[in-house]
């Protein structure tokens, strides 16, 4: 089984999203963090179970259920790279510059 690894940029995005949610609703930042970690477990279990964005690149997306958040990941030969944790309505495809 391939394991997931967060890129530094994705770590920063997750931390920022957790803080933003917690400021709006105390305690909910932890719920967001937990849901992202659960998503990572599902991604590791079913690596290719979620669709790619389009034919322009290898990125796949996992949409969270309870939060307006998408986990963007790329499957390599050795691992699953979590390249972005997109919270809210950020500019579509901004993470593609990270390739």
Regions found by a protein language model. Give the residues of each.
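Arg/Lys-rich, positively charged N-terminal/basic patches that mediate binding to nucleic acids
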Residues: 1-35
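Basic/aromatic recognition patch in beta-strand/loop cores that engages polyanionic ligands
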Residues: 38, 45-79
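Enriched for short, Lys/Arg-rich terminal
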Residues: 67-70, 74-99
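Generic structural signal for secondary-structure transition and capping sites
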Residues: 19, 26, 41, 45-48, ...
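Short, hydrophobic secondary-structure boundary micro-motifs
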Residues: 30-31, 51-53, 94
């Amino acid at each position: 089984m391939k394991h997931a690894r967060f890129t530094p940029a994705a770590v920063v995005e997750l931390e920022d999203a957790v803080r933003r949610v917690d400021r709006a609703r105390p305690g909910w930042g932890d719920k967001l963090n937990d849901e992202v970690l659960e998503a990572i477990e599902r991604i590791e279990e079913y690596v290719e179970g979620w669709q790619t964005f389009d034919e322009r690149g290898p990125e796949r997306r996992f949409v969270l259920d309870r939060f307006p958040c998408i986990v963007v990941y790329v499957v390599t030969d050795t691992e699953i790279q979590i390249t972005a944790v997109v919270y809210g309505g950020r500019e579509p495809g901004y993470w593609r510059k990270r390739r």
